[in-house]
Amino acid sequence: MTLQGRADLSGNQGNAAGRLATVHEPVVTQWAVHPPAPAHPSLLDKMEKAPPQPQHEGLKSKEHLPQQPAEGKTASRRVPRLRAVVESQAFKNILVDEMDMMHARAATLIQANWRGYWLRQKLISQMMAAKAIQEAWRRFNKRHILHSSKSLVKKTRAEEGDIPYHAPQQVRFQHPEENRLLSPPIMVNKETQFPSCDNLVLCRPQSSPLLQPPAAQGTPEPCVQGPHAARVRGLAFLPHQTVTIRFPCPVSLDAKCQPCLLTRTIRSTCLVHIEGDSVKTKRVSARTNKARAPETPLSRRYDQAVTRPSRAQTQGPVKAETPKAPFQICPGPMITKTLLQTYPVVSVTLPQTYPASTMTTTPPKTSPVPKVTIIKTPAQMYPGPTVTKTAPHTCPMPTMTKIQVHPTASRTGTPRQTCPATITAKNRPQVSLLASIMKSLPQVCPGPAMAKTPPQMHPVTTPAKNPLQTCLSATMSKTSSQRSPVGVTKPSPQTRLPAMITKTPAQLRSVATILKTLCLASPTVANVKAPPQVAVAAGTPNTSGSIHENPPKAKATVNVKQAAKVVKASSPSYLAEGKIRCLAQPHPGTGVPRAAAELPLEAEKIKTGTQKQAKTDMAFKTSVAVEMAGAPSWTKVAEEGDKPPHVYVPVDMAVTLPRGQLAAPLTNASSQRHPPCLSQRPLAAPLTKASSQGHLPTELTKTPSLAHLDTCLSKMHSQTHLATGAVKVQSQAPLATCLTKTQSRGQPITDITTCLIPAHQAADLSSNTHSQVLLTGSKVSNHACQRLGGLSAPPWAKPEDRQTQPQPHGHVPGKTTQGGPCPAACEVQGMLVPPMAPTGHSTCNVESWGDNGATRAQPSMPGQAVPCQEDTGPADAGVVGGQSWNRAWEPARGAASWDTWRNKAVVPPRRSGEPMVSMQAAEEIRILAVITIQAGVRGYLARRRIRLWHRGAMVIQATWRGYRVRRNLAHLCRATTTIQSAWRGYSTRRDQARHWQMLHPVTWVELGSRAGVMSDRSWFQDGRARTVSDHRCFQSCQAHACSVCHSLSSRIGSPPSVVMLVGSSPRTCHTCGRTQPTRVVQGMGQGTEGPGAVSWASAYQLAALSPRQPHRQDKAATAIQSAWRGFKIRQQMRQQQMAAKIVQATWRGHHTRSCLKNTEALLGPADPSASSRHMHWPGI
C-alpha cells in the first residue's frame, strides 16, 4: 500500500467512523468486540484512558453533541486506529477471504475423509462380493466334481486304460538315480489296483518284484518300482498261452488280503487246469530259496502245466476208450493228422472167460485160437462207454486190450472158455471180422462140399452202443465136447438161408481154394450142438473198453481138409442157412493151434504181386467178419468123389436192420480167388441206416437191456442157431447179411469211409480181378426184388434217401413190397450182390416168422434146389418175439409200388406210439406250419398297422374338428357382436325417434295453441288423442332419470296432472340381462282446469326443451372423456415407471459388474476434482 493510500485511508477514517456511528451503530455496538492489543504503546495507553462508551451513553452524547463540541473533538481524537482498521472494508474483505479459505480447507478435509470412507466401503463390498462369488463357484465346482467323478473314472478307464499310472513322487527332494525306473510302470488303476494285461505276455525271462519278499527287493517302494526287476530269472510265457496270476496289493507286500486277481483269456487248452488252480488259490506266497531267487506256486504250477497238456487232453479219450484196460496207451487228438497208412500192430489180449448159462456142464477146457486175420489197419481211438466223438487217427502202438466178461443166455451148454482173440475195433462203422468156421451135424443133403473163405473178410454190421464194440476175432466157436473153431449147430426148421450160390466153375474153384486155405490144419470137429446165439470168439464178442484193431502180421490160415458133415446155420434174422460138408477132423479135443498160421500158403498164393499192400491196406476203417454159414437145402454139391471137395458157401454179411426190417443177406465170394474187397465202391463199410445220423452203433442197440452183443445174439430159445453175426436187437430187427443205410439223409456210412479207403484196395487179397459190388438192379429178377425191396432200409427212411443211394455200374433199384416171402436173390439199395451171381435164377424160400409151421413156399426158380424137409418146421414164438413180431411181419404180401411206401408213414413194430412220416409228408407239414406262422404274423402286422392308422385318423379328426369349432366360434362371436351392435343401434335410434316425436316443440306448441283457441273439451280430447299418447319409460340398470318423468313428477303447490303407473309390461335390459318394470304415464295434459292445465304442461315442456340441453350433454361427454383419458394416462405412466425401474436395475447391475473388473472404477480417478462425478451412478 502506498503512502498516499495510507493518508487517504487515515483521512477517511473519520468519515467512515461517522457513517458507521450513524448508520451501523447498532451493528458496532452489537459486536462489542474487544480490539486486540495494539502494536504501539501509545495506543495501549489511550485505550486504557478511554474505556468503551456504552450505547445509551453514545445516544446521549449524540443528542448533546452540539452542546459539547469540545468534548466530541477530544473523543474522536481518542478513537484508536486499530478499530478503524478492523471496521474497514478491506479488513472485512480479508476476513471473508480467510473464511473462504478455511471453508475450502474444511470442505477438502471433509471430502477427503468422505471419499476415503466411501472407497473403503466400496472395497469392502467388492471384496465381500468377490468372496461370495468365489465361495459359490467352489461349492458348485465341488458338487460337479463329486457328481461326475464316477462317470469320469469310468470314461478314463475306457479311453485311457493304457496310460500308465505314476504314483506320487517327491521330485524335488529325490535323488536323480532313484527317479529312474528300471522298467515300464505297471498299468494300474488307482482305485481298483488292477494291473494291465499287456505286461503278462513276455518275450524274455523276467521276474516280478511283486512276487519277491521285501528282502529281495531292497528298499520297499512298491509304488515307484516297476513290476519287473532286471537280472532276475522269472517266468517265461509262451506267446499263445496265458497264466492267471494273483498279484498282491502294490502298497504292501505283506497284505493279509490280496484284492486283485489278474485273469487273462485262456487261448490254449493246455492251461485250463492252471486257470482252475489259480482261481482256487487264495493267496500267492513267495518263497526265496538259497540263491535268493523267487520260487512261487505259480512257477511250480506252470512247470506242472507244461507237462500236463498231454495228460489233460488225453484224459477224456482214455476214459472213453479203455475204462477197464489199464495198459492201453494211445496218443490223444493232439496228434497231427496224417494220411491213412496201415501199421501192423500186434495186440496183446488178455484171456478172459465167457461164462454162459448152459444146460449141460462140461469141464472147462482151453483152446488156443490162431489169428486168422490178414487185416492191416491202423489202430483207431474211439469213445467207449462215454459218447465221446473223436476224429479217426492212426495209432501205431501195440495195445493191451482186456475183454470184458459177457454172459450168454443160451440153453445149449458151453463151458467156460478162454478165447484169446485178435481184436480190431473201429470208431463209427463198428463191424466184426468173424473168421469162425462152423461145422454141423451130418445132414441129409449129400455131396461133400469144401467151402473156402478168403482171408479177406466181409463187412458185417453188428449193433453196438457204447460198450458193444465188435472186435476182429479169429477165434473158433467152442462147444461142450470140442475145442475147435468149427462150431456144430443144429439148424432150425423155420430159418432159411437167403444166399446165392455161384454156378461158374471158376467161381467154385476160387471158393474151394479159399476154404482149403482156411481149413488146412483145422482139428477134428465133433458133432455137438452149439448155442444158437452164443457170442463165441468166432462171433461178435463184446468189449466194454476201447478196442483197437490189431491185425497180426502173419497170415493165419485154417484148412479144413475133410468135411464129413453138413453144417446148417440158422438165424432168426434170416441168416445164411446152409449145409456145409466138411471132412472129419482127426483131433476132436484140440482147437486150431497157433502154428497153423505158419503153414505154407503156396496153393492159395495170389499172383498179383501186391501182398504187402494187401497186408497193410486190408481194413477199410471197419471191422469185417467172415461168416461161413451152412447152405440150406438149395445148396448144390458141384463135385464129389476124388475131386477136392468144394462147397458152395454163401459168405454172408450180417447187417443190422433196426425197426423190424427184413434183409436178405446175399453176398458171395469173389471170382478168381478174390473175395469181394469192395475196392470199386466205398461200400466196404456196412451202410447202416439207423435213426442216429452217422452213428450206427448208437441206434442199433437202443435199449439198456441189450447191453451186450452176446445177449443180443442169444435171444433165441433152445433152437440151435449159428450166432455168427446174427444179432437180435430189442426192436426185433434181425441181423441180416446185407447193407443197411444210415438215416443221414441218404448218405451211407460208406461215403464217410470213402476217404479212408486207399486207392489201392483192389489188391487187398492179392487178387488179379476186382470184385464188383453191385447193388440190386435190373439184372436181378424183378419179382424177387419186389418181395424184398422194402427191407433193405428202415421203413421210416425217406424216399429221397432211398433214391439217392449210390448205384454203381448203372444199376437201378428194383421195386419193393411190404412183406411176404422174399427170395434171397434180390436186394434193394445198399445190399451187396455178388458179381458172380447168375441173374434171374438164384432165389430162396423165405418164410414169415412165427407162422407156426405154415410154410408159404415160393415156386422155385429154374436152377433152384428143393429145400429139405427139416428146413421147414414149427417156429417157436419166443424165438422171434411173440405175436407182436408176427403181427409186424404178417402184413399183406401183395406187391406194392415204391410210391405206396413213399406216401404213407410206416410205424415200426416197437414204436407203434411214435408214427414216422415220410419226407413228403414231413415237407407238407413244414409247409403248412410255415403258412400258419406266416398267416399269424401277417395278421398281427395288419392289425397293428390298422390300429396305428386308426390312432392317426383319430388324432387328425380331433385336430380338424377342434380347428373347425374354434373357427366357427370366432365366426359366431363376430356375428353375435354384429347382431348385438345392430340391434343396439336400432334400439337407440328408435328410442331417440320416439323421444323426439313425443317432446318435439312443434307438437307442444300446436297442442298449446289449440288448447288456447278451442274451449270445447271434446275437441281437445280428440286433438289429444291424435297428438298425445301414453308415456312409457323403461327402467334400466343405468342410473339416469327420464326428462319427461322428471318434469311430470309432482311438486309442492302444483295440482296432480298425470297418473304414473309402475310395473306394467316389463322388459329385459340388454345391458345387464335383468327384467325391469316399465313406467307408464297416463293422463298427460289433463287437469282440473282444462285450458290452464294444458298451458302449464306445455309451458313446462317448453322449458324442459331449452337450448341448454345439448350443451349439458356435451359437457357431460367432455367430463367423461377427460376422466377416461386421465385414467389411461395414469395407467400408462405407471407402466412406464415400472419399465424404467427394471431398466435402471439392469443397468446398475451391469455397471457394478464392470466396475469389479476395472481398477479405475474400483478405486476412483486420481483427480480429486472429478470425484463428484463418480459419487453418483454414471449414465443415470
UniProtKB/Swiss-Prot annotation:
PANTHER family: IQ DOMAIN-CONTAINING PROTEIN N (PTHR22590:SF2), MYOSIN MOTOR DOMAIN-CONTAINING PROTEIN (PTHR22590)
Highest taxon above the source species: Eukaryota
Organism phylogeny: Eukaryota, Metazoa, Chordata, Craniata, Vertebrata
Protein name: IQ domain-containing protein N
Function according to Swiss-Prot or TrEMBL: Essential for spermiogenesis and fertilization. May be required for manchette assembly in elongating spermatids.
Pfam family, one: IQ
Quaternary data: Interacts with calmodulin.
Record Gene3D superfamilies: 1.20.5.190
GO cellular component: mitochondrion; nucleus
Domain IQ: from-to ranges: 103-132, 926-955, 956-978, 979-1001, 1113-1142, 1143-1165
Illness: Spermatogenic failure 78: An autosomal recessive, male infertility disorder characterized by a high proportion of sperm head anomalies, primarily tapered and microcephalic heads, and an abnormal acrosome structure.
An example Gene Ontology biological process: spermatid development
UniProt keyword annotation of Nucleotide-binding present: no
Keywords: Developmental protein, Disease variant, Repeat
Organism, scientific name: Homo sapiens (Human)
Disordered: annotated segments: 34-78, 283-324, 476-496, 786-820
